[in-house]
């Protein structure tokens, strides 16, 4: 059998009845026991689908029916006669795709993904509907910005962590010591003393870049009456007294001045005070790497759905803000950092 699982953070029912591809890594036998080969794989086409139960057999569906992950999210690959069914049917397919022997596949970490193409939406095509806007928009903005970064008084660095949607607590997640140790090793390789390294680290600033919730036109009551971002008005600066967003007032001041100087559109986002919102890795990372932090990102509708919706110009604003940040000469005295 092929084990499968799902993330509790996604709207799982919206994955039903959609053509799904699979992508990830496959671990293959090698000549070295401690170094099995890792092969990356992406199907590039639909190979799975999760068929919904027809309404005739599920009359209560429009009243809200709980999804059972074990029962309702079992994907279908093919419909075969019973005599052709085999427990290693999927392994045979995977081996053929990778041009390896079936018995050499030791394990795999594969995810399903929606293969539908992005599409511009609207009379003037001001919106973009696409899978995986959370959080590939942030990754794309960071990658574009660091290439353009020109500052010479320090180090620009981006960290693209895994497992944010399931709590960050993995060796490759933001709750690990990976970022802290990596930065120390970089400074050590440049010949800096421990004191110089600590001063440079704690004199820095962290942008936690993840998406935000936009005002839903059909559910305006879900948002704060004064701090609700809308699609197309710029990226968001996110705040929370609970520190689920790690933003502090001085970090906001720095970012607002930067955006005002460069004429970059931005908005403020605060959850309704009686609604617990989501969180980002910012508060987790800044605990292990205690520097000024600000949570930012583009606003979305339909977050965590199979297709999400964004304003086209908001990405440009986010990328411009991060680029300006990577070009800024940081002159703050590290001694007053954690005021």
Language-model features: locations:
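Single conserved hydrophobic/aromatic residue that forms the stacking wall/gate
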Residues: 2-9, 13, 330-339
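Metal-dependent peptidase/peptidase-like ectodomains
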Residues: 58-87, 167-262
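Acidic, glycine-rich active-site loops and adjacent beta-strand->loop/helix elements
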Residues: 30, 116-118, 160-168, 211-213, ...
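Alpha-helical metal-binding/catalytic segments enriched in His/Glu/Asp
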Residues: 7, 129-167, 321
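His/Asp/Glu-rich mid-to-C-terminal helical/loop segments that flank catalytic regions of hydrolases
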Residues: 146-160, 185, 298-332
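Active-site-adjacent substrate-binding region
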Residues: 88-104, 212-307
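Glycine-rich, mobile lid/loop segments that gate access to catalytic sites or pores
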Residues: 18-120, 165
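Glycine/charged-rich beta-loop-alpha catalytic/anionic-binding loops adjacent to active sites
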Residues: 116-130, 236, 299-302
């Amino acid at each position: 059998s092929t084990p499968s699982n799902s993330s509790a953070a996604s709207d799982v029912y919206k994955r039903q009845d959609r053509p799904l591809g699979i992508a990830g890594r496959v671990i293959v036998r090698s000549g070295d026991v401690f170094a099995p080969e890792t092969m990356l794989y992406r199907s590039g086409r639909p190979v799975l689908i999760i068929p919904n139960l027809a309404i005739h057999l599920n009359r209560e569906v429009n009243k809200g029916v709980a999804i059972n992950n074990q029962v309702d999210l079992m994907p279908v690959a093919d419909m075969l006669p019973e005599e052709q069914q085999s427990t290693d049917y999927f392994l045979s397919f995977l081996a053929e795709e990778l041009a390896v022997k079936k018995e050499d596949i030791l394990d795999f970490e594969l995810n399903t993904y929606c293969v539908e193409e992005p599409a511009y939406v609207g009379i003037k095509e001001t919106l973009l509907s696409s899978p995986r806007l959370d959080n590939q928009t942030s990754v794309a903005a960071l990658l574009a910005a660091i290439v353009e970064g020109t500052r010479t008084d320090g180090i620009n660095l981006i960290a693209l962590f895994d497992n944010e949607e399931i709590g960050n607590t993995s060796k490759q997640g933001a709750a690990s010591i990976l970022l802290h140790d990596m930065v120390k090793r970089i400074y050590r390789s440049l010949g800096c003393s421990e004191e110089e390294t600590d001063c440079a680290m704690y004199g820095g600033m962290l942008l936690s870049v993840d998406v935000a919730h936009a005002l839903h036109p059909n559910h305006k009551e879900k948002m704060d009456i004064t701090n609700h971002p809308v699609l197309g008005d710029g990226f968001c600066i996110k705040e929370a007294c609970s520190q689920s967003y790690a933003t502090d007032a001085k970090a906001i001041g720095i970012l607002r001045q930067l955006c005002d100087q460069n004429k970059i559109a931005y908005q403020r986002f605060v959850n309704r005070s009686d609604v617990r919102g989501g969180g980002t890795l910012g508060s987790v990372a800044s605990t292990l790497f205690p520097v000024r932090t600000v949570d930012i990102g583009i606003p979305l509708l339909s977050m965590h759905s199979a297709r999400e919706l964004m304003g086209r110009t908001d990405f440009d604003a986010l990328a411009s803000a991060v680029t300006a940040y990577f070009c800024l000469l940081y002159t703050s005295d590290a001694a007053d950092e954690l005021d």
